[in-house]
């Protein structure tokens, strides 16, 4: 059997190529998997579980069809879909996991997370993350009218784009010491995460122990899937479908 991992799809109505690749993946690959893990940023931005647009319903239906077929789906919130909550999970049958958690992957303990919490050198982002994850603020936001939410999100997205233009790639990448600290904290030799859009498999040592960090790819120009079996793992690409 195969366990699949994806992240950073940034699904949005304007990118039909990404959506179609995702749908084909769900129907042709994920349906045959032992489990599917989505490690955040499934959406370009998820405003709230009350989203009932045709696009949101289409994505819900794909997950519902997959879980109904018997394939468990596990989700970790990313920095763009941290408002995805229990209502979405109930409607689709997926399971929401903690921001950082460990799983048993064919006999090996593995730590999985979105990855933004590893980018501790980006102080401005970490402060922003701390703010938007406050429960009282999310409680208020969930009760704001939909049209106002959209305006707020549009303004935030504009600010994020402007901010990124003035940051170095190093600041937006993970901090290696933080990676080692988290792996040591959870007593694991393998970490899987997304967020940085830098797909790769990193092998390194810490305290004389061989460690591995797998970085999932984004879906901006092609699909990216991590396939794990009892025999090993492979980070693979999936081409977009063209007319």
UniProtKB/Swiss-Prot annotation:
It comes from the Bacteria. Keywords: Cell inner membrane, Cell membrane, Hydrolase, Lipid A biosynthesis, Lipid biosynthesis, Lipid metabolism, Manganese, Membrane, Metal-binding. Coiled coil: none annotated. It holds the Pfam family Metallophos. Substrate binds at residues 79-80, 122, 164, 167, 195. CDD domains: MPP_YbbF-LpxH. SUPFAM superfamilies: Metallo-dependent phosphatases (SSF56300). Binds 2 Mn(2+) ions per subunit in a binuclear metal center. Its cofactor is Mn(2+). Its main location: membrane. It is found in: Cell inner membrane. InterPro entries: Calcineurin-like_PHP_ApaH, LpxH-like, Metallo-depent_PP-like, UDP-diacylglucosamine_Hdrlase. One of its GO terms (cellular component) is cytoplasm. The keyword Cell inner membrane applies. Pathway: Glycolipid biosynthesis; lipid IV(A) biosynthesis; lipid IV(A) from (3R)-3-hydroxytetradecanoyl-[acyl-carrier-protein] and UDP-N-acetyl-alpha-D-glucosamine: step 4/6. NCBIfam families: lipid_A_lpxH, PRK05340.1. Hydrolyzes the pyrophosphate bond of UDP-2,3-diacylglucosamine to yield 2,3-diacylglucosamine 1-phosphate (lipid X) and UMP by catalyzing the attack of water at the alpha-P atom. Involved in the biosynthesis of lipid A, a phosphorylated glycolipid that anchors the lipopolysaccharide to the outer membrane of the cell. This is UDP-2,3-diacylglucosamine hydrolase. The gene is lpxH.
């Amino acid at each position: 059997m195969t366990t699949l991992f994806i992240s950073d799809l940034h699904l949005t109505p304007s990118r039909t190529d990404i959506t179609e690749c995702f749908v084909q993946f769900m129907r042709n690959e994920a349906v045959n998997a032992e489990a599917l893990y989505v490690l955040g940023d499934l959406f370009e931005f998820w405003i709230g579980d009350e989203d009932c647009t045709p696009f949101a319903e289409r994505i819900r239906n794909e997950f519902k069809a997959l879980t109904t077929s018997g394939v468990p789906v596990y989700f970790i919130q990313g920095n763009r879909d941290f408002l995805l909550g229990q209502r979405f999970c109930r409607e689709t049958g997926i399971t929401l996991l903690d921001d950082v958690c460990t799983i048993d992957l064919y006999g090996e303990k593995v730590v999985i997370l979105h990855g933004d919490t590893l980018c501790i050198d980006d102080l401005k982002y970490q402060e922003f993350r701390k703010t938007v994850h406050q429960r009282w603020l999310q409680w208020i936001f969930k009760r704001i009218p939909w049209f106002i939410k959209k305006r707020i999100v549009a303004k935030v997205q504009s600010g994020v784009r402007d901010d990124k233009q003035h940051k170095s790639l190093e600041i937006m990448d993970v901090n290696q010491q933080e990676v080692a600290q988290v792996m040591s904290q959870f007593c694991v030799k393998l970490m899987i995460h997304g967020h940085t859009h830098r797909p790769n498999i990193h092998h390194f040592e810490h305290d004389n122990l061989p460690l591995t960090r797998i970085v999932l790819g984004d879906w901006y120009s092609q699909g990216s899937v991590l396939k794990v079996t009892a025999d090993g793992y492979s980070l693979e690409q999936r081409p977009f479908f063209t007319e």
